[in-house]
Amino acid sequence: MNITKIISKTFDSRLKQIDLYATQASEIQHSVLNRLVHQAAQTEWGKKYDYSSIRSYEDFRKRVPIQTYEEIKPYVERLRAGEQNLLWPSEIRWFAKSSGTTNDKSKFLPVSKEALQDIHYRGGKDAAALYFRINPDSHFFSGKGLILGGSHSPNLNSNHSLVGDLSAILIQNVNPLINFVRVPSKKIALMSEWETKIEAIANSTIPVNVTSLSGVPSWMLVLIKRILEKTDRKSVV
């Protein structure tokens, strides 16, 4: 029995919603904007731009100017120090660290619980739903998923927040049930020392039936190369 066929059926209802994106994209985007504006209306940022009186995209466009990260940075620094209800109403404790492509400085991007659930995790589920539609005979769930991410650490300047790669934040906060169908363990996945981490992941993964890969392609290539070296094989298939 192909267990993937059974599990993939749970994604069918979501596919119907995804299909609406192609026919009602504009309406959906306006709905999302209105919802976000309403939710953030009582934050310091929302009050500054009088979000409570915004009724349309045109209102938002005229009221809220395009701004750079440097202009928003003071709010981010206050959030990292423990202040809340500045840019978003729910508690912000996680900050994703960018690679610093602008001004050669890393940026700290606030990550709310809503962003995790409604964007990142839902996006992953949507990608899986579309994959199963295109590949109905997939054996995705017949083995485990190899997930390769970065690491995170406490904010050295404040005990109110944690900083890390977005991938590490996703691994740390994912539904615990995922731990039963993925490798490596969370402890290994979040190691900060890269060489030690690659060795640990390779050693824990080699004996496992891996049926999917998730992670930054360049990082994954390094890991796969190491696994091939350790097993003296030419292919992972």
Residue spans for each PLM region:
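Active-site phosphate/ATP/adenylate-binding loop shared across adenylate-forming ligases
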Residues: 1-237
